[in-house]
Amino acid sequence: MNKKLLSEFGDPVQRVKNALQSLKRGNGILVLDDENRENEGDMIFAAENMTVNQMALAIRFGSGIVCICLTKEKCKILNLPMMVKKNNSKYKTAFTVSIESAYGITTGVSAYDRIITIKTAIKDNAKPDDLNRPGHVFPLQAHPGGILSRAGHTEAAVDLTKLAGLKPAGVICEVMNDDGSMARMPEIINFSKKYNMPVLIIKDIIEYYNFIN
């Protein structure tokens, strides 16, 4: 990672604090993972306060695959089985079956419809019957041990929203360049300046846990 590029956002602890404040205010953040892993940057929003305009931004500048990151307990409550019985993907990304709200939407594709689906899924009293399967929102089940057990964007989204005092559920979407390639750190930082989103890396969250503990 180019630490010089990140330095304008503060040290690791400050970068996490900035991210938590942004999530509390209802704004998005940008999280990069290790360059030896996916080496990609994701937009992350807190599921409970994400807006239609923010969803439109994620769809327009992201991969189009919008995921909601949930705890294992929430996935169990919603009866969301894993997408496949044997996960042989490179990073064992824990996709469940895709979902759609059972009410209040049309085709489920629009930014508005996807927000309705997300709000439906994270309701405190949400039931399995509140969601249709398959759909256009892709749940990801976070590792129960969080970022300290699996250093992925899924765990970052759940851990950061929890640390921010919000429901432990985040919406993520990978950022892409105009030519269809994946955005790396230089492009992510340019994107952050344009849309006023703080930047941090996965390792910052691990350092933050060490700091507060």
UniProtKB/Swiss-Prot annotation:
**This protein's UniProt keywords:** Lyase, Magnesium, Manganese, Metal-binding, Riboflavin biosynthesis
What does the record note about the cofactor?
Binds 2 divalent metal cations per subunit. Magnesium or manganese.
The biological process GO terms on file are: riboflavin biosynthetic process
State the SUPFAM superfamilies in the record.
YrdC/RibB (SSF55821)
Q: In which pathway does it act?
A: Cofactor biosynthesis; riboflavin biosynthesis; 2-hydroxy-3-oxobutyl phosphate from D-ribulose 5-phosphate: step 1/1
Q: Which cofactor does it need?
A: Mg(2+); Mn(2+)
The record's catalysed reaction(s) read:
D-ribulose 5-phosphate = (2S)-2-hydroxy-3-oxobutyl phosphate + formate + H(+)
Q: Which Pfam families does the entry mention?
A: DHBP_synthase (PF00926)
Q: Which cellular component, as a GO term, is one annotated location?
A: cytosol
* Listed EC numbers: 4.1.99.12
Q: What residues correspond to the site Essential for catalytic activity?
A: 136, 174
Q: Tell me the residue numbers annotated for binding Mg(2+) 1.
A: 38
Q: Which GO terms describe its molecular function?
A: 3,4-dihydroxy-2-butanone-4-phosphate synthase activity; magnesium ion binding; manganese ion binding
Q: Which residues bind D-ribulose 5-phosphate?
A: 37-38, 42, 150-154, 174
Indicate which residues the UniProt annotation says bind Mg(2+) 2. 38, 153
Q: What is the similarity comment for this entry?
A: Belongs to the DHBP synthase family.
The protein's matches in HAMAP family, at most eight in alphabetical order, are given as: RibB
Its biological purpose is as follows:
Catalyzes the conversion of D-ribulose 5-phosphate to formate and 3,4-dihydroxy-2-butanone 4-phosphate.
NCBIfam families, A to Z: ribB
Summary of subunit composition and partner proteins:
Homodimer.
Can you name this protein? Answer: 3,4-dihydroxy-2-butanone 4-phosphate synthase
Organism field: Wigglesworthia glossinidia brevipalpis
Which gene holds the coding sequence for this protein? ribB
